[in-house]
Amino acid sequence: AGATTELVRLCDLDIQPCTGCNTCKTGQPCVIEDDMGELYEKLAEADAVVFGSPVYWFRLNAQAYPFIDRFYAYLKPDFSCDFPKGKKFVTAFTCGGVGPEVLNPLNDYLKNVFAFLGFVDAGFIWQGQCYQLNDLANYPEKIEEAKELGRALVR
C-alpha cells in the first residue's frame, strides 16, 4: 500500500549544539529553543528513519553532528535510553570518490548511535561519483535499489 513520508533537511533547520547544561537529566525538556524540539517529536512518532548524508572529507556533513549530539537529551542519568524501541533505521550516503573503506565506519557509527536509541538496523545504501545535487539520477539501478529498501521498510 505505501507509507507516509516526510523529508527533513537538517540544513534548512536551526539546530544549535548541546551546551551540556544537563537540564534534560532532571526530567525537564532540553532548554535550547530551536528546531530540535520538533525533531524530537518527529523521531518519537516515526516508525522508521532514513538517515541520508553526503560524505564530505571522510565524514558526515556538518549539519549531522549537532543533530546527533542533541540525542544526549534521551540519555538518562544511569546511561540507559528513554526512547521508544523497535523503530527501523536505514543509512544512505552519497559521496565523490570514496568507497566502502570510508563509508563502512560512518555507517557503523550511525548504527551504534541509532541502536543505542533502540532502532533496528534495516539497511545501508550508498553511491559514489556524486558531486552535484542531481548526479544520483545517473545511477537508475541505485535508485531502484533505494526504492526496494523503502518498500522493505514498510513491510
What is each residue range found by the language model?
Residues L7-P29, Q132-K142:
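N-terminal beta-loop-helix "entrance" segment that forms/cooperates
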Residues V31-L117:
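Helix-loop-strand module that forms the ligand-binding subsite of alpha/beta enzymes
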